[in-house]
Amino acid sequence: MIQTYHYSNILPRLNKHFLGFYLDDRLVGVVTLGWGTRPLHTIKKIFPSLETKDYYEIGRMCMTEDMPKNSESQMLSQTIRWIKKNCPEVKILFTWADGMVGKPGYVYQGSNFYYLGYIWTDMYMKNGIKLHPRQTKQFFAEDKEDKRLTCRPTFEQQQEVGIQHYRGKQFKYLFFTCGKREKKRLMKECTEPLSRDYPKDADLEWKMQVGKGKWELCSRPPYSTDMNSEIDSGIGLEKAAEKDTAAKENITGNVA
């Protein structure tokens, strides 16, 4: 279902639970719980006393668009209830809203999550397909004279093969799943401002690299989907972009 309805079509690497939500016998929503690429660093930066075991991060969340309004908020509410019942040791539900693809996090705002601000994140893209920096190396001949430690392509390399480099905002949210006493303690400890002064569409911004070290504000990047094993193994970027566009014309989905 995630491959069909989630814009990214791939899963994070660290997944602990997969929750399915049904209307009668039909699967209409999915939430995955786990951690991002740096689990301990993520939580320590916000709550220094907490460990990886003390929180879950929403990896993917998607629901069919034929569901009634506010269904995503109901799904989130059920997710929180499930965590409290089945994972009482978990104190925090953490998540990101991907402003890069135009999402300031309205579903989290509607579910009364706390907002913690935003970061700027990078996206490399070719023909509408998002690439991890490591995935860009397949387009370049090996350069033994390149002594840089990073796997990120230079601006000249990007220009050579038609890769665009964008920057956009990612918005941080969390919900306390612990008891009132622990919540009070954690709110005092929190190193980032907790608020419900939420971002809106007007707060979305994007930048495109136009030269070495030079960036200009731009419109929303023409993102189609993420590079996955199917694309990487032979379908090709052009055909993958066409396939994803056709699928989205036939199947409508929604994501937080």
Task: Give the residues covered by each predicted segment.
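A hydrophobic membrane-anchoring alpha-helix module
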Residues: 171, 175, 180-184, 189-193
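Short, cationic low-complexity segments
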Residues: 186-256
